[in-house]
UniProtKB/Swiss-Prot annotation:
Protein name from the UniProt record: Protein arv1 homolog
Entry function: Mediator of sterol homeostasis involved in sterol uptake, trafficking and distribution into membranes. Also regulates the sphingolipid metabolism.
Lineage of the species this protein comes from: Eukaryota, Amoebozoa, Evosea, Eumycetozoa, Dictyostelia
GO biological process: intracellular sterol transport; regulation of plasma membrane sterol distribution; sphingolipid metabolic process; sterol metabolic process
Sorted UniProt keywords: Endoplasmic reticulum, Glycoprotein, Golgi apparatus, Lipid metabolism, Lipid transport, Membrane, Sphingolipid metabolism, Transmembrane, Transmembrane helix, Transport
GO cellular component: cortical endoplasmic reticulum; endoplasmic reticulum membrane; Golgi apparatus; Golgi membrane
Locations listed in the record: Endoplasmic reticulum membrane; Golgi apparatus membrane
Membrane topology (UniProt): Multi-pass membrane protein
Glycan attachment positions: N34
InterPro entries given in the database record: Arv1 (IPR007290)
Transmembrane segments: 73-93, 124-144, 162-182, 188-208, 216-236
Amino acid sequence: MICIECGRPVNDVYKEFGKAGSGNIRLTRCASCNQTADKYVEYDFIIVFLDLFLHKAQAYRHLLFNRQPYRDFGIPIQYIKVLVVYIFFESYIKWLRFKEYEQHPSGPAFYYIDWQDDVPYDRYWFIFVTAIAEFAVYILSIILSVRFIYESRYPIIKYNYLIMAIILSSFGKGFLVLMMIWDYPFSFGSILNIFVLSSNVVAIKVFLDTTTFKAIFFVVFGFLGKLLFQSIIYLFDASMLLHLSF
């Protein structure tokens, strides 16, 4: 566990007194900064979520280091489920763009695929698999850049926590559901993309305890890796045109 204010390790974030399970707790103060080690212990999750939305580092420290037991490897199943939902939303929006392009070819599109049939419903699987691959390449590119810069200084980096930080900070993808319910312009997806990337910067900065400049470098490297992957797919099959956006 760590102090969410200064990031220093602490033995615990609260002490329980009275009967076990009574709910009577006293928050621990950090010996380094003399602030409450983790104020979010007593807060509802909606408050934590709002602070995530506001890019507050304390909220990321709480969720990554204090909310769940320490893991040497692997990531919790909850993160996997959330990631599947993210990819489903993103794939559906891409599919809608492809469908919109078929109806209005003169307008901008996310996907234009030169399939002979006019019904794109049975092609959703292709977009879904591509979205999975894009996210995987994005994460792997960030991991490679982190290894390149930090491996000599920190030979042991918990990359499972780095992946969790990226998934957690990609919560903005969940707002894509608004485009599924209401008729938002597709530019809304591009705004969400920028928001997600900025959230990734904050989460990586918190986990690695690094500078904002380095965190931006890691995210940009991941973004370029994703762009390169899309370019390779386009070169492999020239009948497919991809634009980097939601």
